[in-house]
Amino acid sequence: FLKKPIDTFYQRRLQVRFEAVEEDDTDNENFDLNGLDRWRLDNELIQEGVVKAASEEELHERLEATLDRMARRGDLGMGVTEHRLRTELAGRLPDLFQRYRGALTEWPEAVAEPLPFECRYSDSTGAVEVVDLIDNLRCNPSGQLCRLVIANAGLLTGSGYSKKVRYANLLRDWLIHLAGQLSGQPFETVILGKEEGRKFHFPVMAPEQAQKHFEAILGRWMEATTRTLPIHCEAGFAWITSFYGGKKFIGDHERAISEAEQAYSTALDRDTGYLLGAFESPEALMASGEFEALLHQLYVPLWEAEQGKSAAEQIGSME
């Protein structure tokens, strides 16, 4: 829902699913990985190598064995292509392995059992009960808890100094983090990015603050099954990072709107039908005036946790 709020109404209420149509390229038979294949192989290498290896030597042995298995399955193509993909897939894993081992040193003891979570919420739209188990928990010698995970997807986009955080790929772990603060055993969250040297951290929160954010998400999720909410993830974070984190453009409302509209226009270009069916233009998305209220409810708390700062204080510091 948080990643694709507009899709929720179509899929849950109308039972409509638009599928992306891929055209066969009959003139070009060069082997390469699509995004989903690369994600699958990436995570197989991480689970079989980074997570299970106890030393650098064992890491390289495990990576080679896993890559050989992928090659036998035909996942890596042949010849020069296979060599290139082996290098691309395994190249950044030694850095990730070192960071993972460092985190294990800080949080040495794995929690044997997952942490149960249960939450009931109701409003004028209806009622919902959320029940789940939270895993990947570890503790330090002081008994403090941490959920330590390696990111499933890339957490940065762009290159060089223009790199930006892909907040959409932090949403799942953020939601689990909020839930954990309500479990009676609050924990911090550490997410190791696949990108070199990158780590994201969510600190322990006051239960009442986490409950406010969690219930706001549940309430909007239920509402999203009754109508298309005028909010879009990438557009929302484009507004937030411009208005609250735009350095020399901080507090510039017109620029924030422009950044959000540009992000939504980009999303429309690759839309399979959901966005065009609901809000066919950036102007249509903004027309009701709800966009900014929704992004403050659904997305600003994540930005604040990742940045370690208050959005309101960012604006207050200018006064």
Model-predicted segments: where are they?
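Structural signature of nuclease core domains in nucleic-acid processing machines
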Residues: 1-319
